Amino acid sequence: MTNITTGTEVPNLRDETLEKTVWFDPDELDYLPLEEGEHSDVEIDHFQRTIYDYNGAQPIVVDRECNIVAGRGRVEAARLLGIDEIPAIPLSSFSSDDLDHYIDTMIRFGAFVGWSAEMLEADLQHLLVIEALMKAGRGDTTAKIQ
């Protein structure tokens, strides 16, 4: 697949993502130097709560040298919780330029993403419907929210 705007090849991450999720000791991972500030204590607390509540379900992203590309806050939270292993997706096929572009894109994307109370309420209501359906033994989690 070719990127329409730049003409560059878009990597196919399907195989890499689905087949190569690995587990790392958080202390084996290194941080890439970033110009952006570190996460606040409040943000780390939120990461810890999410890991605790959802069993750390979201993998981090690492490069071929085990540098954290995405998920610094989750790694720090896992360390503070004393977690021995966390899931990671290695982007070993990325060049240095690819990684720089990926990180820049993720930082820019993060700056544009915002949440409102209304968005959170809608998400919560959807999750409550799914939970109720699952408890009722119905596998149909696509029901419309009233």
What is the predicted function of each stretch?
Residues 1-92, 99-146:
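Short, charged/polar connector segments at secondary-structure boundaries
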